[in-house]
Swiss-Prot record:
Entry GO MF terms: ATP binding; G protein-coupled receptor kinase activity
Family: Belongs to the protein kinase superfamily. AGC Ser/Thr protein kinase family. GPRK subfamily.
Protein's recorded name: G protein-coupled receptor kinase 4
Subunit structure and binding partners: Interacts with DRD3.
Keyword Nucleotide-binding set for record: yes
Annotated catalysed reactions: [G-protein-coupled receptor] + ATP = [G-protein-coupled receptor]-phosphate + ADP + H(+)
Native species: Mus musculus
Active site: 311
Length: 574
């Protein structure tokens, strides 16, 4: 029995190591990722939405190919260099920001330049210079300048890009992205745990060697529990979210017996394991604060899409290989319509907010309560209303949540006590995060004084703990109970409509990131002869003008600079 677990663990570790060394790819990986002739992409060329933000910013491969196109033209290359510099300025530490900003201004706005930027009104340049000379210039000093550069790129350069071989190559990648996904796309490894409708196991994409977690939803179990709406809701929410602080959905497919969600694999285990199984219960405060800061970013991303999570607890917060956390298991999450409130008594006993227990309406307040519970538990080593290993029935626990005030030990600093007490206020209208300032008020709490959120969101801060790469942070295979066989349920043709809606294949942004991270994009694109051969397929027909011509981030505080930033945080349509 122990031998079975040992073998399964070794196979998984070998597969994980294979991706890091790019040896996990199938020997036939080039055949699996063979580009079609551009002539096969004609329909795709005309059906794809000609949106500059989507094609050249949000989609990672599109972003890289557009940059490669710009590198062939000095004026466009200059624009990209400016956007890169501004993106770097935005994540520069405050002490160095002014000096770095002045260096950018000197480099790109001096009067005599062989390759000047697109014309920017003198009053905007003057205001930019004045702001930079202040002691603490803001992060968005270059916002208007960057917006003008982005608008310039979205017009004639974008049209020229669509007539180039680089866009032809992009269409070939899109063709590969849209191919059907089946169980044969992956290698399957050991079971990692159990979900509500089936097992979760590790899997590996044959073509790239990329490791994922495959969450299997047994078809008969879904039908017996009438879980179709819940399963589809989780899939749709994951599909529209692209946050480094929430697990990503990369693929959906079906087998004869199951619907499968292929998700970010988190090899570092969950917070519950780390709180209670490695030394004394609880963390040192700096570690708890780091995780709390990343959770704030994750909740902000969810709320930006008007999603309330409703199940924050240590088991649902997972660590990746590098020690960063992500929110997982969005089965209870739901979208809150603009201007409305929702009601629903869902969650886990001991972590549910008072307004949920009382059947009251809410928007995002339960998640700020959940964050308070998590911060408290990470520091104290037990949840706010139940001692470690204390046996308490549901009714008593709910009574404590509604009526009692949590107690604080000497492990809590004044700042830690302050944020927990502000997040655990019974009245949601007075709770931290629930007023007009929302997440900004939480981020500005003194406990986060040493956290640079811009750098955190750009993945530029080192975690306080890095999981052991040789460890398997999950239970032994034999300790993970098996599901019983579902009897008395028959699948019919009516179920096929639901299955077709669920199993839609690759998700654009994660799939393209996989191609880049695995090195497949670089390896296949380095063949310049192959790229130049695309010229003979070049289409001479006029290209439709884009319906929108601004970067998405032009409408945000940080400006439209995502072309130079790392992981995209918004979805794009297939």
């Amino acid at each position: 029995m122990e031998l079975e677990n040992f073998v399964a663990n070794n196979l998984l570790l070998k597969a994980r190591l294979g991706f890091n060394k790019q040896t996990g790819r199938s020997k036939k990986w080039r055949e699996l990722l063979k580009f079609p002739p551009v002539s096969m992409c004609t329909e795709l060329r005309w059906s794809i939405e000609k949106d500059f933000s989507s094609l050249c910013d949000k989609q990672p491969i599109g972003r890289l190919l557009f940059r490669q196109f710009c590198d062939t033209k000095p004026d466009l290359k200059r624009c990209i260099e400016f956007l890169d510099a501004v993106a770097e300025y935005e994540v520069t530490i405050e002490e160095e920001q002014r000096e770095f900003g002045l260096a950018i201004f000197s480099r790109f706005f001096k009067e005599k330049s062989e390759v000047p930027l697109p014309e920017i009104p003198p009053d905007i340049v003057k205001e930019c210079k004045w702001n930079l000379k202040q002691n603490s210039p803001s992060q968005n000093v270059f916002e208007e300048c960057a917006g003008i550069v982005c608008k310039y790129l979205s017009e004639t350069p974008f049209e020229e890009y669509q007539e180039s071989t680089y866009f032809n190559r992009f269409l070939q990648w899109k063709w590969l992205e849209r191919r059907p996904v089946t169980k044969n796309t992956f290698r399957q490894y050991r079971v990692l745990g159990k979900g509500g409708f089936g097992e979760v196991c590790a899997c590996q994409v044959r073509a790239t060697g990329k490791m994922y977690a495959c969450k299997k939803l047994e078809k008969k179990r879904i039908k017996k529990r009438k879980g179709e709406a819940m399963a589809l809701n989780e899939k749709r929410i994951l599909e529209k979210l692209h946050s480094r602080f929430v697990v990503s959905l990369a693929y959906t497919y079906e087998t004869k017996d199951a619907l499968c969600l292929v998700l970010t694999i988190m090899n570092g285990g969950d917070l519950k394991y780390h709180i209670y199984n490695l030394g004394d219960p609880g963390f040192e405060e700096p570690r708890a604060v780091f995780y709390a800061a990343e959770l704030c970013c994750g909740l902000e991303d969810l709320q930006r899409k008007r999603i309330v999570y409703r199940d924050l607890k240590p088991e649902n917060i997972l660590l990746d290989d590098h020690g960063h956390i992500r929110i997982s298991d969005l089965g209870l999450a739901m979208e809150v319509p603009e201007g409305e409130m929702v009601r629903g008594r869902v969650g886990t006993v001991g972590y549910m907010a008072p307004e949920i227990i009382n059947h009251e309406k809410y928007t995002f307040s339960p998640d700020w309560w959940g964050l308070g519970c998590l911060i408290y538990e990470m520091i104290a080593g037990h949840s706010p209303f139940r001692k470690y290993k204390e046996k308490v029935n549901r009714e008593e626990l709910e009574r404590r949540v509604k009526n009692e005030t949590e107690e604080y030990s000497e492990r809590f600093s004044e700042d830690a006590k302050s944020i927990c007490s502000m997040l655990l206020i019974k009245d949601p209208s007075k709770r931290l995060g629930c007023q007009r300032d929302g997440v900004s008020a939480v981020k500005q709490h003194p406990i986060f004084k040493d956290i640079n959120f811009s750098r955190l969101e750009a993945n530029m801060l080192d975690p306080p703990f890095i999981p052991d790469p040789q460890a398997i942070y999950c239970r032994n295979i034999l300790d993970i109970g098996q599901f019983s066989v579902v009897k008395g349920v028959n699948l019919d043709t009516n179920d096929e409509i639901f299955y077709a809606e669920f199993a839609t294949g690759s998700v654009t942004i994660p799939w393209q990131n996989e191609m880049i991270e695995s090195g497949c994009f670089k390896d296949l694109n380095e063949n310049e002869d192959d790229l130049s051969s695309l010229e003979k397929y070049k289409m001479c027909s006029s290209i439709l003008r884009p319906k929108r011509n601004f970067f998405r981030r032009l409408f945000r505080r940080t400006g439209c600079l995502n072309i130079a930033l790392s992981e995209e945080r918004e979805p794009t349509e297939h």
